[in-house]
Every structure is written in C-alpha cells, then in structure tokens.
C-alpha cells in the first residue's frame, strides 16, 4: 500500500497530564511526577493523517512510538506484493522497538493517529536505570507475543465464520480495556483490512458478515457490529 508523505504536524501545546486519556495504559504509566516530566521532554507529540506511515519495514529503526489516539495498522509485504496485516494498535500501545536496527514491519494510520514519538537512543538511555520502565516494556512484549499467538490460531484450520467471530471477540476484548464492556464492536478498519489480517478474501469476509447477521448472531451497524447473542457468538469464536 502506498503511503502519503511523512507528517510535519506536531501537536503544539500538548501536555500528557491534561491531554492524554490513556496515560495509565501507556509506556509511561508507572512513572512518578519528576520522571514523567523528564520523559515528556524527550517526546515529540505528532499527528498523522489517514494512511500516513509512522514507519516502514526495513527502514532504520531510529524512533519508538506510544500511540495515544486513533488506530494504527501493522503489516508486512510478502515477496509477491500481497499485504499481510499482523495487527492493529490501539491507544496505549507501544510501537517500533525492533529487535535489530531496522523495523521488521510497517505501521500506518487508519483514520488519523496521535503519538508520542521518541528517538530510540535517548529513550533507551532513559529506561535503562528505571526498573519500572523495564517491567513495563516486558509487559508490552508479553502482550505482543500473546496477540501474535492468537493470530497464528486465527490463520489455522478454522472456518471463515470461526475466524471472523474470533477476530471480533478478540477486538471487542481489547476495546473493553479502553471503553468498557459493550455489545457494539467498533470497526474502524475496513473489510479488506480484516481480510488481510485473517488470510481471507474480501468477498469471503463480506459474505461471512452477512451470514452471521442472517443467523442473528450480529447486526451490522454504521460504525461496526452489534453482538445479539454473546453466548453463542463467544462459543463460535472459541471453536
């Protein structure tokens, strides 16, 4: 997918204390006031428009990102040019900590995101003598591994219905950390994004949504889906 130009928009006047709704979930959530003030001085608060790239696969991994607003799409390009989406990042998620000196996947904005962007060197120097930050990093890495394992199961021998249901339940549970439990599952990503995440065609995903609605498990609403029978739906997702 082609990207628009890298942004030049910084969030003038942004202050974590008054503007960040996900500070408790973010990488800085365990810092005391003095450490947090120093940490914020390292940050650039940047706004990316729809489809703008935060970073691209194989670029030098010189920055890390704490997502504070919006949804980011994480993906790799296969040798034949096809796209495999490997995840969707939510507010509070931490991105860009590559195992080597280059990013191993790409990240772009779905509908506009705001991030705290840190140059990698100063960030690593800041956390190295702060055990609470190292523990926080470990928590993020553990969660990322769990999500990767969940996707491996999704790409396994499941029917299209089971894959779509499992995706919706997993996404609903992630949203619940931000918004609380609700029967309506907001879907800012399109059907093609869901298809590229599940290893299905967009036609199969669209037919599956229609079938789930016809079976009265969900109803399709403008911003996502509403689960009509949570017990049956969760059972299908767990199959």
Curated annotation (Swiss-Prot):
Listed GO CC annotations: cytosol
Which PROSITE patterns does the record match to this protein? CNMP_BINDING_3 (PS50042), HTH_CRP_1 (PS00042), HTH_CRP_2 (PS51063)
InterPro entries to which the protein is assigned, alphabetical: cNMP-bd_dom, cNMP-bd_dom_sf, Env_Response_Regulators, HTH_CRP, RmlC-like_jellyroll, Tscrpt_reg_HTH_Crp-type_CS, WH-like_DNA-bd_sf, WH_DNA-bd_sf
Q: Tell whether Transcription regulation is among the UniProt keywords.
A: yes
Q: Residues that bind a nucleoside 3',5'-cyclic phosphate, according to the entry?
A: 27-149
Instruction: Name the DNA-binding stretches.
Output: 191-210
Classification via Gene3D superfamilies: Jelly Rolls, Winged helix-like DNA-binding domain superfamily/Winged helix DNA-binding domain
Question: Coiled coil: which residue ranges?
Answer: none
> What are the entry keywords?
Activator, DNA-binding, Transcription, Transcription regulation
User: Which stretches are transmembrane?
Assistant: none
Molecular function (Gene Ontology), one example: DNA binding
Q: Where is the HTH crp-type domain?
A: 158-231
> Which PANTHER family has this protein been placed in?
CRP FAMILY TRANSCRIPTIONAL REGULATORY PROTEIN (PTHR24567), FUMARATE AND NITRATE REDUCTION REGULATORY PROTEIN (PTHR24567:SF75)
Q: What does this protein do?
A: Transcriptional activator of anaerobic gene expression. For aromatic acid degradation. Also required for the anaerobic degradation of benzoate.
Q: What else is known?
A: Possesses 4 cysteines which may bind a metal ion (possibly iron).
Name it: Transcriptional activatory protein AadR
């Amino acid at each position: 997918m082609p990207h628009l130009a890298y942004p030049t928009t910084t969030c003038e006047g942004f202050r974590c204390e008054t503007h960040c709704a996900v500070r408790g979930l973010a990488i800085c959530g365990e810092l005391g006031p003095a450490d947090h003030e120093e940490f914020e001085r390292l940050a650039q608060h940047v706004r990316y428009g729809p489809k703008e790239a935060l970073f691209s696969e194989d670029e030098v991994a010189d920055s890390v990102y704490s997502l504070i607003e919006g949804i980011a799409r994480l993906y790799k390009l296969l040798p034949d040019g096809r796209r495999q989406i490997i995840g969707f990042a939510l507010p509070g998620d931490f991105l860009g900590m590559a195992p080597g000196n280059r990013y191993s996947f790409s990240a772009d904005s779905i509908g506009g995101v705001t991030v705290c962007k840190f140059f990698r060197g100063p960030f690593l120097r800041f956390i190295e003598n702060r055990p609470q930050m190292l523990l926080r990093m470990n928590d993020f890495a553990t969660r990322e591994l769990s999500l990767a394992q969940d996707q491996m199961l999704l790409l396994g021998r499941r029917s299209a219905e089971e894959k779509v249901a499992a995706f919706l339940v997993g996404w609903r549970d992630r949203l619940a950390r931000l918004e609380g439990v609700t029967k309506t599952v907001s879907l800012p990503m399109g059907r093609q994004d869901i298809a590229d995440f599940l290893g299905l065609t967009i036609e199969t995903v669209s037919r599956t949504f229609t079938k789930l609605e016809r079976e009265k498990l969900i109803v399709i609403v403008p911003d996502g889906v509403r689960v009509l029978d949570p017990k049956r739906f969760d059972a299908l997702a767990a199959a």
